[in-house]
Amino acid sequence: MQATASKGAQRERSGQARARAIVRFNGLLFHSLAAASFLETAVPLHVNRLNQVFAACSDVVLWLEQVWWPQRAEHGRRLRDYLEATWPEFNWNAAYQEFYDSYRPRSGLAGRGAGAALEALGLCVTAAQAAVFYRALANCADEPALRALARRAACDHGGCFDYFSALFERCKHDERVGLMTSWRTVRAACRSARDFDASAAFEPLGRHWGGTPTVPELGYGEFRARMVPLIQRHAALGRIERLLFRPWLESDRSAPAPQLPEKRPERRTLLAPQPVAA
């Protein structure tokens, strides 16, 4: 009986090793996880600005600092640990530093000037997209450790979506945010996640390997072309989620760097918040 249990455990370990080996040579998974790890880790860049936006809501500031920030930081740490265990040749520190130096000066610019309601709506978009990404990853991953990591992240981002959605409903009446303004904000947040956040996180991934990379290098356009059908196939998208991902299906466009909003009061409510991507 003991010998049977030992053989079963050995088979399980062998199966897990084979699954990890398959992941190790999967370029799409590497680029997805590495980009996600950067964006999760970079959340502190957004916290101070968000605290200013929601300064009148002390409960929101407390939640951002005690729940949202630590939760995102934990996901960043878990992703980094997984990456370093699976792809030890990849220099995560150097790649993240390059991303951080490029991302920091521009992060959050598109959201400055937006009110609390539109900022909350942009954060809804970000959380929904992240939850869908992780859900697709959990449903398609062969390795148990990766499935567990992705499921936890999907659940946590889903909880953030619920929080930001309730916050948007709470703020929109005071700021008189209309349907068209909301829709423009959603579209702008989706495009910003696609053209700025994910693109910036993707940019340094091919340049920081010690020796020959174990995965083929992907251009960002090719990455998008492969990632979108994977999400469509494995994430079980609802109607609203399909709308959120529509911009990812559009043709590539050269996206300008986010600019500070023009000082035109009558247009301010149309400015989309800069989402915190995942």
Regions found by a protein language model. Give the residues of each.
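Non-heme di-metal
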Residues: 1-278
